[in-house]
Amino acid sequence: SGTHDLPRPKMWRHTSVETYKGGVSRSDDGGRTWKPSNAGMAETAATHILLDPTSPAEARTLYVAAFGRGVYKSSDGGATWNLKNIGITQTNPFAWRLARASDGVLYLIVARRSEDGSIGNDGDGALYKSSDGAATWTKVALPAGVNGPNGLATDPKNPQRLYLAAWARATGIHGMGGGIFVSNDGGKNWKQAFDRDQHVYDVTVDPSNPKVLYAAGFESSAWKSSDSGEHWTRIAGPNFKWMHRVIPDPLNSESIYVTTYGGGVWHGRADGKPGPQDIATPELQPGR
């Protein structure tokens, strides 16, 4: 698509969202071959695809966050798409991430498009929710001082419990208005659950244990909480500046994957301690 993973203006390669090229492709053979599946979708950078797991296998319901376009929905496994932006107030919305709670409510993150540290400008990010399968959207108030939402996770056992990852505004040494925030009432009220890194890219809930959370950020950090965000421990191990996302290993709850910006994918123990099969970086020893 030509779009950087995190939509920040200084990283764009194009002057307008209309110049981005991309869309959705589908594979029916496990990823060996792919073909475009974009009927009804404008040329766009698709930043996220969400599948409704309750939809029938022969006609999957899919949602796409389209950079500069909004949200597209398909009810036939991606064969055709329709734009679903009723209630989204931004012009050319930078639809960034979608999430689905266990009760079927959808959430949409619209990315911030400005580096401005002020609140209330046209570049503010936003959070929306839909209770009717994306037919209409309602804006959810962000936590006070936040205008850069990045990621959203829901508790699989409590659909009203939301975790929001936010990117700081460019104010102060490390910025402000970032971290992780939690809501126990579907986004009506928020409280800060983590502020040790003001530039948090994403927050993840372990599907095997909803009390376990992971966070990844810019300050060379990955974090873990075992009590629903009350306390956090830094995960040692990944030696890279900009973490992207922490993904629990589906085959081993004691292991995680950590994706990064340009530093590859790391795999190791969730506590960060090296295991007997870890691969160590070789040291250069000239002359030996």
For the regions a protein language model found, what residue spans apply to each?
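Extracellular glycan-interacting surfaces
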Residues: S1-R288
